[in-house]
UniProtKB/Swiss-Prot annotation:
Catalyzes the attachment of tyrosine to tRNA(Tyr) in a two-step reaction: tyrosine is first activated by ATP to form Tyr-AMP and then transferred to the acceptor end of tRNA(Tyr). This is Probable tyrosine--tRNA ligase, mitochondrial. Residues 416-480 form the S4 RNA-binding domain. GO terms for biological process: tRNA aminoacylation; tyrosyl-tRNA aminoacylation. It comes from the Eukaryota. Its EC number is 6.1.1.1. Gene3D superfamilies: HUPs, RNA-binding S4 domain, Tyrosyl-Transfer RNA Synthetase. The lineage of its organism: Eukaryota, Amoebozoa, Evosea, Eumycetozoa, Dictyostelia.
Amino acid sequence: MIRNFTKGLLINNLNINKFGSTKIRPFCSTITKNDKNNVINILKKRGFIHQMTASDIEMIKMTSTNNNNNNDNNNNNNNNKVSLYAGFDPTADSLHIGNLLTLMVMLHFKRHGHNPIALMGGATALIGDPSGKSSDRVMLTEEFIEGNLKHIRENITAVLGEDTLVVNNIEWNKTMDVISFLREVGSYFRVGSMIKKDFIQNRLSDSNENGISFTEFCYSLFQANDFAHLFLKHGCSIQIGGSDQWGNITAGCDLIRKKLKGNAQGITIPLLTNSAGKKLGKSEGNSIWLSPHRTSPYKFYQYWIQVSDEDVERLLKLFTLIPLEEISILVQKHNENPHLRLGQKTIAEHVTRLIHGQKGVEEALNTTELLFGESNKLLTPNASTTKIGDFDIGYLLSRVNFIELERSKFVDNQTEPILNLFAQISDASKSKVKQLLQSKSIYLNNIPVASNSQFIQSSDLIANDFIYLKSGKKIYYLIKFI
């Protein structure tokens, strides 16, 4: 039973019923009646656009579609369908929520009837993108990159759908020799112009002793050639990227204009920051990844639950498909009772469902309920059930941040009482821990620790491996003995 979080709100398809459970609108592959505007206008209103290589009028004209029919099923019937792409270098075995911002832009284009193309940089990852970096990237092996590609593809299709065209630039780069590259690509670029680009200037500045290698200096030429290849083969005329990709994107636009006499444009997305100007996407110093083997659905969900009230409206616009009119009403309701965290819970459920599906949402909600809700009473070795919902309690606990400790040191060892263990993991003094114990403020598996000498016994272990230590409402430690 999921704990009731909110009360009494109905916003079109976003339904918070009187018992508090949230029902999220199903994923919609095409635009709704409330989103009839051009995709560029929608992106600007939602805060996605940092820079564009053409004026608003030109970009709107380029991406205009015939959406005059009120039947949602006909929204893909248009005369001006464009293909656009964004690149994702497989430098890790998962994308992160910074990449998700780019995927959301592509999703908006797709819902407006356009064709997104996801490019996996199997070739460019071997070179290393210098954009936004102060020193050379570590050179990656082909085997490492190949191992990452499968996970990156899964991240992409989770958001954009299995029907999305996903390409790997190793396909056309592996057969191009150096002479052909210099003649067919390099001849269209001038070193003077390349040096003037901001990301090159930053690496060549007096304050940067590392400089830039010739390998990374040529990166933008490879990315430009990717754009030209997609322009020729797939009619791709727009490239999407982060704000640090402006120089690489304009290089591609220039190559298409000079070599192919074509018209191509670029759009950059602002850096993802919170209201305090701090870069979003990390929790306790760790990146928030899209792949469940890197960030579990519970941890992913909790990241969004913990965003500040000041960031709620912006994140609703960026990471959900809720129409803007509904977001305004939702934010108003959120501000009336911010302690209910309606905005954060809406974001968390929408984004978790988008990335991990309904099962991921259920895993996250059940884990949250297990740790903080009424089902917390199940965190005892003698609980009446070993499951919550469809999930085994041991499995849910294994997906939470836990501390690993040596079993032989703390379990069935009378010389290592809970007092010592709690002091070690909390960095509190033993005198402070003694005060907490005397006031019955430390709980082992939801039962107050009885004395300073109480130690952990095998019979205390949940799912054979875990204990749950808690002090107050906000301080808890999940410990796994190995």
